[in-house]
């Protein structure tokens, strides 16, 4: 009788093997929604800009004042451009409270313009003329946002 027990157990589990892998409910969307709810701004946009974007801007301005030399000279340019590109993507999702649909669209478009210019600046590392050009476009886009959403305050100098 004991000899037949493994055969009986195998026979009982055989139909389960034909069903394919046991599937779990797809909770990716639910988890993403929950994660989005968890990540709320720590502070207001003014402080976000002051403590994240402004140091990167100042570092870029100093690094591009003269032509950087070698990898060490270009490192602050890469760092600043990368930080500003990635933070502009984050800023795009933080539309000002009370913004109507038109203002929200404008906010996201300017954020995208800053992102594209910062990304181009990052990609131009090693080419001083191209880097200066992309830096200038990026600053123009930052100032467009400050004009539209901060009543013209905080205009950046190239």
Set out the residue ranges of the language-model regions.
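N-terminal hydrophobic targeting signals that begin at the initiator methionine
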Residues: 1-3
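Sequence context surrounding c-type heme c attachment/ligation sites in exported
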Residues: 5-6, 22-158
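Bacterial N-terminal signal peptides
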Residues: 6-15
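N-terminal Sec signal peptide cleavage junction
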Residues: 17-21
């Amino acid at each position: 009788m004991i000899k037949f027990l493994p055969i009986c157990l195998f026979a009982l589990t055989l139909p389960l093997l034909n069903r394919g892998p046991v599937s779990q409910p797809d909770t990716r969307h639910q988890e993403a929604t929950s994660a989005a709810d968890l990540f709320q701004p720590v502070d207001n946009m003014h402080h976000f800009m002051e403590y994240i974007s402004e140091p990167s801007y100042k570092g870029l301005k100093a690094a591009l004042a003269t032509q950087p030399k070698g990898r060490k000279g270009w490192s602050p340019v890469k760092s600043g451009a990368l930080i500003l590109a990635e933070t502009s993507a984050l800023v795009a999702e933080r539309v000002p409270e009370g913004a109507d649909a038109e203002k929200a669209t404008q906010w996201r478009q300017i954020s995208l313009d800053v992102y594209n210019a910062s990304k181009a600046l990052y990609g131009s590392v090693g080419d001083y003329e191209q880097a200066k050009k992309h830096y200038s476009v990026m600053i123009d886009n930052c100032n467009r946002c400050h004009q539209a959403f901060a009543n013209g305050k905080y205009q950046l100098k190239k």
